[in-house]
Amino acid sequence: MANRGQFGSKFGFIMAAAGSAVGLGNIWRFPYLTGENGGGAFVFIYLCCVLAIGIPLLFNEIALGRLTGKNPIGAFRDTGSNKFWIIGAILSLCVSFFVTSYYGVIAGWTIGYIYTSLMGVELSFAEFTANPSIVIPLFIGFIGLNLLIVTKDIAKGIEKASKILMPVLFVLVLVVIIRGLTLEGASAGLRYFLVPDFSKINAATFLKALSQCFFSMSIGWGIMITYGSYLSKNESIVKSALWIGVLDTTVALMGGLMIFPAVFAFGMEPNQGPTLVFQILPHIFSEMPGGNIVGAFFFLLLCIAALTSTISMIEVPGSWLIDEKKWSRKKAAWAVAIAAIVFGIPSALSKGANDTLTNMSIQFSGMTITSFMDIMDFIWGSFFIVIVSLFVCLYVGWIIGPAKIIAELSEGTPSFSTAKFAGVTAAQVWSFFIRFICPLVIIIVILNQFNVF
């Protein structure tokens, strides 16, 4: 069997797993969803989703990975899964692979914006994304950065890179936050972001917040199962998962603190959607003293956030090739990367470079989703993430039973299954959530996507 490797320390695992969770979802997606859904009201519901749904599912996936020491498909198979339940594991590999194919395109844009910010070049976002001679090389270059890390073993590659990149990411975020808070009028942005208006809360707010929770925390991707398989039995999953949740949520909140003070200081509208980062913020930076440096810092941290996420996405199908096909790590990483580039080129061409790919659309539940990239994002980055999460929930809660996972969670944290509060243990609470609360909420989300509610 090929040597899978293992994380060398608890800190390294936390940084790698938090790096996977912390990505464009926190710094790009979370702020624009907040802007579209009532500011502080959305933040409040999101935090509730993280605590009630995200953390229990994070425990679940990491423990399943460490219990078996395998990739998602191997984890299901080794715990007695039949062919039906393995569908969930296969879908998790597909999610990580196909999201990599278009996520890498967006990450490539950040590299281009680092350069234009430093040079003080005014750039039309539409013209930039429509130029294949720019976006495709940037995309390939970004995937190449991933290969430099993923081809090395776990401790020397992903763990070492994450130990460096995650602290750098936090420092860069703080630099941009401090600069934004010094702008005149920034306080209005703080109020919008942090003060909830509960009249804005409705079913749609809750559902969008829950979907963002899955996207942001790498739940339903197979990533946490894979990373859990590299975690030593001596480490506490409970403490590590709590740290991952805290770090991921902190960066999401810091993303809002970066963006909204600057948006309000320059009189911009906060509900600009996905274009907020690439169209609105460069204009704001250009108006700031020293804005080219601040802008370059901002897009550098976006690039780092994307990198710490994509290395984990490539690792998921890569670990399957290592475990099941006995490939070397280098061969598996190259195969996944090349395939991601091939499948990602249509996404790279679908923002203006090719009319067919740009204008193609699908109808789903009253929504029109336009462009190849947006269709891929909806299918793999929204819909199937939720489906995979449901599969894993039901599989652990009702097929293999929570007992094996509770035993795994109790290693390193014996109090998880022994210490009682108000007459119940944390293990009993977790078991109730994983069997009833989490599946019920996920099913409601899925049914809502089909307009049942």
Model region roles, listed by residue range:
Residues M1-W28, L57-I62, R66-T79, K83-I90, ...:
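Membrane-interface "cap" regions at the ends of multi-pass membrane proteins
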Residues A2-N3, F7, F11, E159, ...:
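Membrane-embedded translocation segments of transport machinery
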Residues R4, G74, A107-A130, L231-N234, ...:
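Helix-loop-helix connectors at the membrane interface of multi-pass transporters/channels
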Residues R4-G5, Y32-N37, L67-L91, G104-T151, ...:
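Inter-helical loop and helix-membrane interface segments of multi-pass membrane transporters/permeases
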Residues F11-C49, G228, V238-L242, V246-L247:
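Transmembrane helix-boundary motif of multi-pass solute transporters/channels
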Residues G54-N71, W85-F125, A306-W320, V386, ...:
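Hydrophobic transmembrane alpha-helices that form the core helical bundles
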Residues L307-T310, A333-S347, K351, S365, ...:
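Hydrophobic alpha-helical segments of multi-pass membrane transport proteins
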Residues S365-V396, A419-F453:
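A generic transmembrane alpha-helix motif of multi-pass inner-membrane proteins
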